[in-house]
A protein has these predicted regions:
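N-terminal membrane topogenesis motif
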Residues: 1-30, 84, 213-217
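Transmembrane-helix boundary and interhelical linker motifs in polytopic inner-membrane proteins
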Residues: 6-11, 42-46, 60-94, 145-151
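Small-residue-rich midsections of specific transmembrane alpha-helices
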Residues: 24, 30-35, 51-77, 131-136
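Interfacial/gating helices of multi-pass transporter permease domains
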Residues: 35-59, 182, 215-217
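Alpha-helical transmembrane segments of multi-pass membrane proteins
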Residues: 59-63, 97, 101, 105, ...
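C-terminal transmembrane helix end/exit motif
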Residues: 72, 139-146, 150, 170-173, ...
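Membrane-interface junctions at transmembrane-helix termini in multi-pass inner-membrane proteins
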Residues: 84, 133-156
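Hydrophobic alpha-helical transmembrane segments
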Residues: 120-128, 154-202
């Protein structure tokens, strides 16, 4: 019984269990540290504005990709490693980006039409396209999760946390609230770029999704 348990633990460790556990702890520490630094850098008024804008963004993100991410997790797991799986991811990436571009215009219009303070209103315009970059990152992560690339999944999550929190702190220090969101874009672009370099070998980013789906049907 004990030997079976040891073997099971070793198998899980080889599949990246310890990487995922370690990355989770590491990311929480980085996020917590970043929040403490952010409170010290920004004034009470600036932090209040940042929290307000961030909360509204989180509300809009309830419509993130219109469920594409959850769908890819489900169908990707069913058709793992098949041409159809790659086609689903390509199709989902396109649809998710289109949905979030529409969402981006909604966020921008909300800021321009319903936020009276002009300095706060412009922040909604600045953050409006963050969901577009966010869903690309999330789909890349789901892809790794489906294929059980647990080690890269963990490293990629940590990379995103470090870049975003680092960008947040640096942006806040030099440019205030606007800098936070501006550097968030830079961090997300860097993370997406790293993901594309790794995922290029899979070929799904470049395949014709409609042709593959039609053939499989």
């Amino acid at each position: 019984m004990r030997n079976n348990t040891v073997i099971l633990i070793k198998n899980l460790a080889q599949r990246g269990l310890m990487h995922m556990f370690g990355a989770n702890v590491f990311n929480k520490i980085i996020s917590f540290s970043g929040t403490i630094l952010l409170v010290r850098i920004l004034s009470k008024g600036e932090y209040g504005v940042y929290a307000y804008v961030q909360n509204i963004l989180s509300f809009f993100l309830l419509l993130n990709g219109l469920g594409v991410v959850s769908g890819l997790l489900q169908y990707g797991s069913v058709y793992r490693n098949s041409p159809l799986m790659y086609a689903f991811f390509k199709y989902g990436l396109r649809r998710g980006v289109i949905a979030n571009i529409i969402l981006a215009f909604g966020i921008g219009l909300f800021g321009l039409l319903f936020v009276k303070d002009s300095s706060t209103s412009i922040l909604f315009v600045i953050i409006s396209f963050i969901p577009v970059f966010t869903i690309i990152y999330e789909i890349f992560q789901i892809y790794n999760l489906v294929l059980r690339n647990n080690k890269f999944y963990s490293l990629y999550t940590s990379l995103n946390t470090v870049l975003v929190m680092g960008g947040t702190v640096v942006g806040a220090y030099f440019l205030g609230v606007k800098g936070i969101f501006a550097f968030t874009y830079i961090a997300l672009l860097g993370c997406i770029g790293a993901g594309m370099v790794y995922l290029k070998r899979g070929g799904w980013i470049w395949c014709d999704a409609r042709v593959v789906i039609t053939k499989e049907e």
